[in-house]
């Protein structure tokens, strides 16, 4: 089946509400997602792509460039990766990851990285490991 990966657009808002809600565990309103799209449009480093197959949005990839202060290098950060539940295990996530890695190469990045939370070891962490990613540390968060 043919597919395309393209930048997210306002027409995608209903599907984006669903996918981002699945990922975050929170309900997002169309106004929330419209705000996020506006932020991405105004950002010099953030990008949001959709995987579309047969005119149906099936997956979502958030990507941004991270410049390092401590060394002269940059990385591509995969900030969002999710597919519709019925599309999991069908290669959509792999295609989106490959797209992100190529985008990072095209922008002169040293590599790609992502953050994946606890409780996702059975699916997401195994998926990332199969793609060649290695766990290198922890993220520490303090609510304010």
Predicted regions and their residues:
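Conserved acetyl-CoA-binding loop of GNAT-fold acetyltransferases
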Residues: 109, 128-138
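Alpha-helical elements of Rossmann-like donor-binding domains used by nucleotide-donor carbohydrate transfer enzymes
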Residues: 15-19, 35-36, 95, 99, ...
């Amino acid at each position: 089946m043919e597919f395309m990966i393209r930048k997210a657009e306002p027409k995608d808002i209903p599907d984006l509400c669903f996918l981002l809600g699945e990922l975050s565990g929170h309900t997002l309103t169309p106004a929330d997602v419209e705000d996020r799209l506006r932020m991405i449009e105004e950002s010099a480093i953030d990008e949001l792509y959709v995987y579309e197959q047969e005119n149906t949005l099936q997956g979502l990839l958030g990507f941004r460039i991270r410049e390092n202060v401590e060394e002269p290098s940059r990385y591509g950060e995969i900030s969002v990766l999710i597919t519709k539940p019925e599309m999991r295990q069908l290669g959509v996530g792999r295609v989106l990851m490959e797209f992100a890695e190529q985008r990072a190469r095209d922008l002169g990045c040293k590599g790609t990285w992502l953050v994946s939370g606890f409780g996702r070891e059975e699916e997401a962490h195994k998926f990332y490991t199969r793609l060649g990613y290695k766990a290198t540390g922890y993220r520490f968060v303090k609510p304010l």
